[in-house]
C-alpha cells in the first residue's frame, strides 16, 4: 500500500519576535489613527486588525499520484483516505468594516495540512454579521478563499477555501472576541513514499491531494 508523506528538509526562518512585535505595533498605531479620523458618532471602527488561533481536525484526503518507481516502472494511484489528524493554525488579519453588518479582511497565517506538511496561506475573507449594533454580542457567518505555499522541498503552490460561522462577544467598541467553527478544504502537493523510498520530484508527474477538515478557533479583533 502506498502511504504518502511530506517532510520539510529546509529550515524556514521567520521574523523574530522583536520584528513581529514592531509590525503589530505599527499596525495598531495606524489602526488607532484611522479610527480617530472617523466621525465621533460612528458606532464602529473602519479599520480592523486581529489574531486568530484554531485547532484543525483533518478527516479525509483525496489524492492522485503519478510517478516513476525506483525500479523504473510507472505508478498511477488514486484514492481516498479517511482518518483523524490534528493540527493547529494561526492568522494575522487586516480588514475593513464596510458597514455594521459586513467586513472584508486579508488573512496571512501558518497551518498544518493533515499528516502531509505545513503551509503559509493567504486568503481574502468576507464576513456577514447578524445584527446592526456592533456594541452587542451577535452571530456571524463567513467565507474565504486564497492561495499560498507548502513548506516542503520543493515549494509548491496551494489553494485554500473555508466556510464557517461563529459568535462574537463585544468587549468594547473596538475589541471583539470571536468563537469560530469552520469547514475547510486545501488543495496541496504532498511528497510521495513508495516501498520505503522517497520519490524525487524529477520522477513525479502528479502529486495532488485535497484535504477536508473541520476547525475550531478563537479570534480577537480590535
Regions found by a protein language model. Name each.
Residues 1-45:
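Cleavable N-terminal export/targeting peptides
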Residues 25, 29, 40, 83, ...:
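Residues embedded in well-ordered secondary-structure elements
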Residues 31, 62, 137, 176, ...:
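Generic domain-boundary/flexible-linker signal
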Residues 36-96, 211-222:
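Short glycine/proline- and aromatic-enriched beta-strand/turn motifs that initiate or cap beta-hairpins
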Residues 49-61, 106-110, 143-149, 165, ...:
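Transmembrane beta-barrel strands of outer-membrane/channel proteins
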Residues 59-82, 88, 106-122, 149-155, ...:
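Flexible, solvent-exposed loop segments that connect beta-strands
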Residues 91-164, 169-177:
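Gram-negative (and chloroplast) outer-membrane scaffold detector with strong preference
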Residues 156-216, 222:
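A generic hydrophobic-segment detector
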